[in-house]
UniProtKB/Swiss-Prot annotation:
Residues holding Mg(2+) 2: E304, N306
Record carries keyword ATP-binding: yes
Organism name: Corynebacterium efficiens (strain DSM 44549 / YS-314 / AJ 12310 / JCM 11189 / NBRC 100395)
Region annotation Oligomerization domain: where it falls in the sequence: 408-565
Name of the protein described by the UniProt record: Carbamoyl phosphate synthase large chain
A matching Pfam family: CPSase_L_D2
Coiled-coil blocks: none
Entry binding sites for Mg(2+) 3: Q845, E857
GO molecular function: ATP binding; carbamoyl-phosphate synthase (ammonia) activity; carbamoyl-phosphate synthase (glutamine-hydrolyzing) activity; metal ion binding
Record-annotated ATP-grasp domain positions: 138-333, 695-886
Enzymatic reactions: hydrogencarbonate + L-glutamine + 2 ATP + H2O = carbamoyl phosphate + L-glutamate + 2 ADP + phosphate + 2 H(+)
Binding site for Mg(2+) 4: E857, N859
Free-text comment on this protein's domains from its UniProt entry: The large subunit is composed of 2 ATP-grasp domains that are involved in binding the 2 ATP molecules needed for carbamoyl phosphate synthesis. The N-terminal ATP-grasp domain (referred to as the carboxyphosphate synthetic component) catalyzes the ATP-dependent phosphorylation of hydrogencarbonate to carboxyphosphate and the subsequent nucleophilic attack by ammonia to form a carbamate intermediate.
Length: 1113
């Protein structure tokens, strides 16, 4: 069945900002889809609000709209494309995660698809609803002879109580049409039930929840399937969760293929999966289905399905080499599986199911340290912010590799022995077993500790519900440790066995201290000729030859085993080190820069080699770089890749400046080991990080910086703070994403900080800086080739200094800076770039106060804002930086047209659009152990997971779009609640007067209301929670927010403890109900401008391709 001839113009709906539960995997799937559809000669239009994605690059589609993924904007795109003579005839919504599916359902319900005669391809509305609606899906499972957990769909709390009476506690609560388990949970008590089911009803767009019998402790599996228009179905991959049911699959360590299924169980699941995909009606494309197996009696239950490409699809795709998203796009336009060739072999059709001759392990990356007070129990609501994948010849080797890929404090078993075995816990087996009953991030380390304290597999299974097979694998590792420890000498056979089990040199050194650390183990290993061989992912267990070089390392027991790395060409090679797992502070933006470097260097004649371990990203797609290594980003693993590449050709150098802090942290050791680092040198990177050297540079260049001092103890910190004056900003040195940073207003808070934060880093001191209150913060991206500096973009933060730049909204071009300010920025940036010795990208943060431009920090690397600046100005910064690294000058790039002539990012043409970047925060995912919300205040510590961009001709419209994209659509009428700290009251009067004149009802607390009334603003006084607690009659503001009576909240934090508690409750209830919340004075002003733009109805849509012409005209 060839391609359909009635499809000419496809709208691909992207997934929007990175949030927990929906991350970079959808950029990867959407990018593949856009490429395929364009290759097939179709016109492609894309909507996605996230600028940090490859899919929103102008080359990926004919028209790219960086707009909020909402029906009104999609309808504007339909209208605009008709006006331009290119009507859209089909929409592909199965590759943009839950966001795209929910948008498609709304388009259908509002009649927009019918109005414009547009068809949904991949999965129609009925199939989406049958897969996503809990009751419909349950009926389908029954139809095909499968079994679901006993459950009922409830629309209100009365129905919930009735169901629980029948099923008994505990129960699982799951809302419909949400992703990443948002709003779901386990209810053990009636209090739990009220909290979780109430929240679940609020989280579900359909206002219904499924209450299900608890199948906690069962084994959980997933099957990834594809179906074409001829009803051919293939099963691509089985995935098994190491954690038992009760931990969200996104938070569990998972393994592919499934390890503990019997053949009979696998066949039952396979048959049911195929019957379900047919019955649901996913006509074309991928889906994943989750099953549970009762370990006691083998009863199999179908849990749920995603009728779309999902997080698991990205994992299955990278694990097998089978390009699921690419095929889903081909099948959606009419091809069948037997008509599409598998890219990796070049000869087999996609109808051949992949076979694996290796084991894949995925491990989640968490960020609980960013949310003090959050409950770190792993439940059915997903909490991890990223993940890694590793490939090995056996399960334990793949697991060891995955754990060290995570880049947490503990790089695998035994690598943090001092901290880990501190205190009584190290010897108290019962305490460890008790801890294992509550799943947390470190549970595998707890299992290993319990084994060394003598726990049996039966005891551990009882405590953790982890299948005995996985426990036995870990027991073999613990037994091997004893053998390794007790051997009188570490000979070749024993060292080979250790490496075969996936142990790193660092882990071996921890057990054999006489080898003098990791370097000593490496020297011994090399002297014995023990190196990894590199195997190939080929989808067919070596039955056919692979055409795409996609490698992983393995140590074989046989010394004669051969590597499969063959030189592709005679070209010089450049290694690009990726950014590892997504985490807060280091996300998809860095992957974006790595991908651009790979594509650009390939284009100009280099052979590009990507090293990364993140399965969600475009950088680990098999056709992004010329060669891909799926390896941990540790010194040992990178050195072995470099050695293998050097053996098969000439390596021009390694690029470390694009992947964030991860590769930067390796730069010095790599250079010392003889690896050529191209671009900015490790010495220059260190100079920018070292406060003393950097301070000297500022002195020489006569650039002002806030006064600062360094301290190794509380006494020293107190002396520094007294000298430079409070408030001060305190932080450890060498951090990304503002880890452990705080603004401190007095000595007591300083002492509290030092006690909490000095454990962050023993060898690095704490830095104490003068904090510039109420300054304007400015973010700058620039390129430097060693001689010339190009100012790429000047962004003005909307929040004042003190909010981490990754969490602050910002505008480009800047809104309140004059020509003189920008000239100061340009000259200061030039002095810094040349003084540091930057070759490539640099990011500088400034604060402007009383007409003095202070340098806050300079980072000689690709920044978080590089993709945003690239989209807003039409200049591909990462491509330019990669060319500078291999010797091009800015003049060369100007001559090629990559960098504009006649202006820079500080002097954009007058008709250039205004771009606003807004951060997306994950507070709805985290709760305190008692179930209360976390405080949502912004601080110098970064908390956002992703970002969106708003583009328009004026600031108000751009800001309004950015807020809509970040899930905080501003209201155009209704009720506004105002409660601001005393120091902010004068600053907000004008903004509130404008809201009053637009007809909003104003609610205010007593103190704020008095000030508003004195300024002629009519408002209603509302009670604070503390008033009601003290016995005042009436409903508090928190009650009114929870009852849906408030449309916008303006609340800046106050100083006293009582006021702080009231503010915390107000902000927490805003997150629970989903009311837009503004917590800074500048944010209030911006919000009012946004509301005015919305009321004027000025929101138009323009494709990036048109804007590029406007910027470059």
């Amino acid at each position: 069945m060839p391609k359909r001839s009635d499809i000419n113009h496809v709208l691909v709906i992207g997934s929007g900002p990175i949030v927990i539960g929906q991350a970079a995997e959808f950029d990867y799937s959407g990018t593949q889809a856009c490429r395929v559809l364009k290759e097939e000669g179709l016109r492609v239009t894309l909507i996605n609000s996230n600028p940090a994605t490859i899919m929103t690059d102008p080359e990926m589609a004919d028209h790219t709209y960086v707009e909020p993924i909402e029906p009104e904007y999609i309808e504007k795109i339909f209208q605009k494309e008709i006006e331009q003579g290119h009507p859209i005839d089909t929409v592909l919504a199965t590759l943009g995660g839950q966001t795209a599916l929910n948008a498609a359902i709304q388009l259908d319900r509002l009649g927009i698809l019918e109005k414009y005669n547009v068809e949904l391809i991949g999965a129609d509305i009925d199939a989406i609803e049958r897969g996503e609606d809990r009751q419909k899906f349950k009926d389908i499972v029954a139809t095909i002879g499968g079994e679901s957990a006993r459950s009922a769909v409830c629309h209100n709390m009365d129905e919930v109580y009735a169901t629980v009476e029948e099923l008994g506690l505990p129960v699982v609560v799951r809302p419909s049409f949400t992703m990443g388990g948002l709003g779901s949970g386990l209810a053990y008590t009636m209090e739990d039930l009220d909290r979780i089911a109430g929240g679940g009803l609020a989280a579900s767009p359909e206002a219904n929840v499924l209450i299900e019998e608890s199948i906690l402790g069962w084994k959980e599996y997933e099957l990834e399937l594809m179906r074409d228009g001829d009803d051919n179905v293939v099963v691509i991959c089985s995935i098994e969760n190491v954690d038992a049911l009760g931990v969200h699959t996104g938070d569990s360590v998972t393994v592919a293929p499934a390890m503990t299924l019997t053949d009979r169980e696998y066949q039952i699941m396979r048959d049911q999966g195929i019957a379900i995909i047919r019955e649901v009606g996913v006509d074309t494309g991928g889906c994943n289905i989750q099953f549970a197996v009762n370990p006691e009696d083998g009863r199999i239950i179908t849990i749920e399905m995603n009728p779309r490409v999902s997080r698991s699809s990205a994992l299955a795709s990278k694990a097998t080499g089978f390009p699921i998203a690419k095929l889903a796009a081909k099948l959606a336009i009419g091809y069948t599986l037997d008509e599409v060739t598998n890219d990796i072999t070049g000869v087999t059709p996609a109808a051949f199911e992949p076979t694996l001759d290796y084991v894949v392990v995925k491990a989640p990356r968490f960020a609980f340290e960013k949310f003090p007070g959050a409950d770190d129990t792993l439940t059915t609501t997903m909490k991890s912010v990223g993940e890694v994948m590793s490939l090995g010849r056996n399960y334990i080797a793949a697991l060891n590799k995955a754990l060290r890929s995570l880049e947490t404090k503990q790089l695998g078993f035994w690598t943090k022995p001092d901290e880990y075995f501190a205190g009584e816990r190290a010897t108290d087996l019962q305490a460890v077993l008790e801890d294992l009953r509550r799943p947390t991030e470190g549970r595998l380390y707890d299992v290993e500790l319990a084994m060394r304290l003598g726990a049996t597999i039966e005891e551990l299974y009882d405590a953790s519900s982890i299948d005995p097979w996985f426990l036995a694998e870990l027991k073999a590792l613990v037994d091997f440790r004893e053998k390794l420890e007790d051997a009188p000498v570490l000979d070749e056979a024993l060292l080979r066995e250790a490496k075969f089990m996936g142990l790193s040199d660092l882990q071996i050194a921890a057990v054999r201290p006489e080898l003098a650390g990791e370097d000593g183990v490496r020297r011994l290993r090399h002297s014995l000729g023990i190196r990894p061989v590199f195997k190939t992912v080929d989808t067919c267990a070596a039955e056919f030859e692979a055409k795409t070089p996609y490698h992983y390392s393995a140590y074989e027991l046989d010394p004669a085993a051969e590597s499969e790395v063959a030189p592709q060409t005679e070209r010089e090679k450049v290694l690009i080190l990726g950014s590892g797992p997504n985490r807060i502070g280091q996300g998809i933006e860095f992957d974006y820069s790595c991908v651009h470097a790979a594509l650009e260097l390939s284009r100009v004649g280099y052979e590009t080699v990507m090293v990364n371990c993140n399965p969600e990203t475009v950088s680990t797609d098999y056709d992004t770089a010329d060669r891909l290594y799926f390896e941990p980003l540790t010194f040992e693993d990178v050195m072995e890749v470099y050695h293998a590449e050097s053996e098969s050709g000439t390596v021009a150098g390694v690029i470390v400046q694009l992947g964030g802090q991860t590769p930067l942290g390796l730069a010095e050791r790599l250079k010392a080991a003889g690896v050529p680092i191209i671009g900015t040198s490790p010495e220059a990177i260190n100079m920018a990080e070292d406060r003393g050297e950097f301070g000297d540079l500022l002195g020489r260049a006569q650039l002002p910086a806030p006064a600062f001092g360094t301290a190794h103890s509380f006494e020293q910190a107190r002396a520094v703070a007294n000298e430079i004056g409070y408030p001060v900003l305190v932080r450890p040195s060498y951090v990304l994403g503002g880890r452990g940073m705080e603004i401190v207003y007095d000595e007591a808070s300083l002492e509290d900080y030092i006690q909490r934060a000095t454990e962050l880093s023993t060898e690095h001191p704490v830095l104490v800086d003068r904090f510039l209150d109420n300054a304007i913060e400015i973010d700058v991206d620039a390129l430097c080739d060693g001689e010339e500096v190009y100012l790429a973009g000047v962004m003005e933060h909307i929040e004042e200094a003190g909010v981490h730049s990754g969490d602050s909204a910002c505008a480009l071009p800047p809104m309140t800076l004059g020509a003189q300010d920008i000239e100061k920025v340009r000259q200061s940036t030039r002095a810094l770039a040349l003084g540091i010795g930057v070759k490539g990208l640099m990011n500088v943060q400034y604060a402007l106060k009383d007409d003095i431009l202070y340098v806050i920090e300079a980072n000689p690397r690709a920044s978080r804002t590089a993709p945003f600046v690239s989209k807003a100005t039409g200049v591909h910064l990462a491509k330019a930086a990669s060319r500078i690294a291999v010797g091009a000058t800015i003049a060369d790039l100007r001559a090629e047209g990559m960098i504009p002539t006649g202006y820079d990012g500080g002097s954009l043409p007058l008709d250039a659009p205004i771009a606003v970047k807004e951060a997306v925060l994950p507070f709805n995912r985290f709760r305190r152990p008692d179930g209360r919300s976390l405080d949502t205040l912004l601080s110098p510590e970064m908390k956002s997971t992703g970002e969106v961009m708003g583009l328009a001709d004026n600031f108000g419209a751009a800001y309004a779009k950015a807020e809509t994209g970040a899930f905080g659509t501003l209201p155009t009428e209704g009720t506004v609640f105002v409660s601001v700290a005393n120091r902010d009251k004068r600053s907000v009067i004008l903004a509130i007067q404008r809201l009053d004149s637009m007809g909003f009802n104003i609610l205010a607390t007593e103190g704020t209301a008095g000030m508003l009334r004195r300024n002629g603003i009519d408002c209603e006084v509302v009670l604070k929670s503390s008033d009601v607690r003290e016995g005042v009659e009436g409903r508090s503001i928190v009650d009114r927010i929870r009852d849906g009576e408030v449309d916008l909240i303006l609340n800046t934090p106050a100083g006293s403890a009582g006021a702080r508690h009231d503010g915390y409750e107000i902000r927490g209830s805003a997150v629970t109900v989903g009311v837009p919340l503004v917590t800074t004075v500048q944010g209030v002003t911006a919000a009012v401008q946004g509301i005015e733009a919305l009321r004027r109805g000025e929101l138009t849509v323009r494709a990036l391709q048109e804007l590029d012409h406007a910027v470059k005209a």
